[in-house]
Amino acid sequence: MEKEEKDVKRKEIRQRIGKRVAVLRKFAGLSQEQLSETAGLQRTHVSRIEKGRYSLNIETLQAIAEALGMTVDIIDPGLQDLAPLKRLTP
């Protein structure tokens, strides 16, 4: 796969996850500010994630899932293999 194709695929993944985070956050009745506080993130990060402009690492994804009261596979079923993982610590 060429670099351009990989970049497009990554962008699509970021956008898909971002849209899902936004839908689930709203369904939970949370503002971006509330989600960011609960997940330990800056509100601007939550905004960028929801717009598909921020690449998530597993720790951030796990923090968002926990703040929403769910597992990462609910955010994106393609991530089901990550669902059993707990937040990673160095």
PLM segments and residue spans:
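A short, Lys/Arg-rich alpha-helix, primarily the initiator
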Residues: 2-27
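Short, charged recognition helix plus adjacent turn
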Residues: 2-6, 76-90
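Conserved hydrophobic/aromatic packing and binding residues within compact polymer-binding modules
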Residues: 21, 35-36, 46-49, 75
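Recognition helix of helix-turn-helix/homeodomain-like DNA-binding domains
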Residues: 40-55
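DNA major-groove recognition helix of helix-turn-helix/homeodomain DNA-binding modules
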Residues: 59-74
